[in-house]
Amino acid sequence: MRPCVFLLLSLGMLGAGDGSLDRATLHGVTSMNVVIDRLDPELEKAGITQDLLRSRVAGRLSMAGITVDPAALEFVGLRIDSFLARKGPASLSLSLAFFQPVLLVRDQKVRTASPTWEVSTILMVAPRPLVQSTMDAADQLADQFVSAFRSVNPK
């Protein structure tokens, strides 16, 4: 039996969170951090770690000439929600977003980080290629970000 990966939905390809207004919020950004949300311990047992994902996403950004700076206030955040069945395929939802500091108009003492650009994808994957399929999906999302970033910040 051949392992197979099913791409159920790629919201990034539909343009959700990657429209012209979303891309405009990336204009003028000079550097960014890379943050990986806490992962399900089962994903870590399978070999998918925050460090592996962080280095993978940061590497894609660096290869595209985007400065990765751990001290930057702006950051690219990757979130993975998962359901790992004991038998059968795993279900993964990956979301990559760009977060920037924002102030509330009505109360400028309130500061927070908010996503201003985002793409997502959902996978169903057999257990054997789980790590590689997850890395490939993270690469695709990072590449979508690079494309969006470069569309408003040409080299």
Predicted regions and their residues:
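Arginine residue identity/basic-tract feature
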Residues: 2, 23, 38, 54-56, ...
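N-terminal, post-signal-peptide region of Sec/Tat-exported proteins
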Residues: 46-75
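A structural "domain/chain start" motif
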Residues: 7, 12-55, 147-155
